[in-house]
């Protein structure tokens, strides 16, 4: 079993990795800098998983307020008392409050990522795009490709009014 170092990014010992014998994998993550754009249903689950890895930094970006419908689309269960007490809290602040208990490298950004500020993400190891606005996703995708940023687009961005156009057909990011 590997001994935990003082530079551990977790706020308490990661006994899961040693139990599974995968400490060697953790070394591959130690210098990674991850950005998660959007903390809706998909983005919050990405954060839930990434926060349990020893990546150096996790930056979360979202300018939306955590609302009742988000409680049904996020990991865990939010109490009705907490929903009422934290009414109007930003998504990034809500999730930071939870996941910073475990991971010391989380930074919350209460803003949208746009073409005007996307260059701030040029030095990230990986960027997860998990937003529901197709035009913004398309623009960010093009920007990341142009900057050479490694990204994963995981949002679906399907609205009921669009279903007739999308039903039984393939969607392409090509112009």
Task: Annotate each language-model stretch with its function.
Residues 47-48, 72-73, 139-142:
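Short amphipathic alpha-helical segments
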Residues 22-65:
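Glycine-rich adenosine-cofactor-binding loop
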Residues 57, 105-107, 150:
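Conserved beta-strand segments of alpha/beta enzyme cores
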Residues 63-103:
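Glycine-rich phosphate-binding loop and adjoining beta1-alpha1-beta2 segment
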Residues 123-175:
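E1/E1-like adenylate-forming module used to activate ubiquitin-like modifiers
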Residues 1-32:
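Glycine/serine-rich phosphate-binding loop and adjoining beta1-alpha1 elements at the start
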Residues 90-126, 131-138:
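A structured beta-alpha segment of the ubiquitous adenosine-cofactor-binding alpha/beta core
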Residues 36-40, 61-63, 110-111, 129-132, ...:
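Short His-Asn-centered micro-motif
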